[in-house]
Amino acid sequence: MGKVIGIDLGTTNSCVAVMEGTQPKVIENAEGARTTPSIVAFTDEGERLVGQPAKRQAVTNPSRTFFAIKRLIGRTYDDPMTQKDKGLVPYHIVRAGNGDAWVEADGKQFSPSQISAFTLQKMKETAESYLGQPVTQAVITVPAYFNDAQRQATKDAGKIAGLEVLRIINEPTAAALAYGLDKKKSGVIAVYDLGGGTFDVSILEIGDGVFEVKSTNGDTFLGGEDFDNRIVEYLAAEFKREQGIDLTRDKLALQRLKEAAEKAKIELSSATQTEINLPYITADASGPKHLALKLSRAKFESLVDDLIQRTIEPCRKALKDAGVAASEIDEVVLVGGMTRMPKIQDVVKTFFGKEPHKGVNPDEVVAIGAAVQAGVLQGDVKDVLLLDVTPLSLGIETLGGVFTRLIDRNTTIPTKKSQVFSTAEDNQNAVTIRVFQGEREMAADNKLLGQFDLVGIPPAPRGVPQIEVTFDIDANGIVNVTAKDKATGKEHQIRIQASGGLSDTEIQRMVQEAEANAAEDKKRRELVEVKNQGESLVHATEKSVKEYGDKVSESDRAGISTAIDALRQALAGEDVETIKARTTDLMQASMKLGEAMYAAQAGGGEAASAGAEDPQAKKDDVIDADFQEVDDKDHKKRA
């Protein structure tokens, strides 16, 4: 069995870790960073960029650069949060055939699961490069407050990326695992997790290797992106006030504002003031316009105060559901990049009445916890038991549109619960089971997860047939529902697939596309590598001709010149094999030059002339000299 990796698929950044013996290790990506921006872009040439390369070109390619895609995963196009997001991002959000929110670039539509899969592929490749072996299995984290559709969509993303997702684990729970792994502590901890796009709070009880989640709460549309947007709105408003130009209508300017906002936000965690300078942000008839202003920490805090306060109510609810007071919390663990903001730390300290624990890296702790869970599933980590909960109540719609709960929120999972219902009308031969998730009393106000029909019920007066509805939630928090007519034994079971969501056929198509893209990416990479190699050889050869050209014959110089021209011509094209062949030709042609060069270095100008007359003899001389040098070194070592 290969290694199982742990992946934190974040809104802003993603991170991958693996267990090495009993210790988790965060793996650096190809760029040498421990986290990877969750950004995917498509260039003019159709090339796909993931991570830092995608982020670098975002300003010049805003409509084809997808960021914060996690906010759309598992959401419908008509969802109020999707509509809110539409006004905040420069790329196109479109309605898919199934009613889900998808994104579009150059006329091609992508599901959020597919875009997330590209980031997961990058994480997979990062792990494979480090481990030196293929990786096919992973534990992936999601916000604790993700509903069933969002969890299923995350699992689909893993599948598209070529990963078997062994477990979907809640981010605060993963953080608690990482926090508590080496500690022999026991007690009640609160995990306050404010990331790039989502907020979660979980109350856990830890003791003797058992991590039991008592309650969880949160907001799946509250995070660093919202803090960035407040700065963007402020900058745009100030610029409009001074210059009379609305920058929000210009996608290029908007992307520059977004980058500047993120940078300013980060700087204000350590500095009390930052300067934002964006020259040539736009232009009008009078000429180019520049944006330059100072932003103080106090001003930033006033811009986002309501966002920070929005995290307090979920904390209050989580404590109430867990049946503990703030004073009974032994430790508050901060997770997510936003918790570096001093004001957030102050608010958390005030609410819980204690200094929050800052001993974990907020950007890496979730991936580390995922790796620990991967180690548990693989059998490498012993004596750790994780008991998580379902974040939202589950139930069905009953007469009058009422939401009848079968499983209450914060129930430990996996769990199974049954309840008997009956028909609403005489001689009713079929019932429609509509499954909802949420906390509102009327079904329509909650999230519809899916529906199915149980048919073939024998005619009977209303209230007589007995229909047993069973909810089964697995350890990933994904729901199965069964309806059974107790009189006939007739049964209908579904794994909840939202009215939207990806079908197996669509997932399979996306898997194949991902594989095809991987092959295409490999070809592109090979082309870039052989071109780089060819260009380096041309440069080195031309330099050598200038220095040592007089040491070789006229015909050799002509041969080298012809080979350089042929390689240059090949480099202008896209044919890998032709470039390789012309590179080899130039290497062969320039061998005489190389011999002359070594001869000149080893024996001076006279020897080099001899080398030009008798290259083979000189080659031998060079080799002898080479061995002589080594012998000298050895002799020195012995002495």
Curated annotation (Swiss-Prot):
Pfam families: HSP70. Residues 601-639 are annotated as: Disordered. The modification Phosphothreonine is found at T198. One of its GO terms (molecular function) is ATP-dependent protein folding chaperone. SUPFAM superfamilies: Actin-like ATPase domain (SSF53067), Heat shock protein 70kD (HSP70), C-terminal subdomain (SSF100934), Heat shock protein 70kD (HSP70), peptide-binding domain (SSF100920). Induction: By stress conditions e.g. heat shock. Residues 630-639 have a biased composition (Basic and acidic residues). Keywords: ATP-binding, Chaperone, Nucleotide-binding, Phosphoprotein, Stress response. Residues 601-613 have a biased composition (Low complexity). Belongs to the heat shock protein 70 family. Acts as a chaperone. This is Chaperone protein DnaK. It comes from Methylobacterium sp. (strain 4-46). The gene is dnaK.
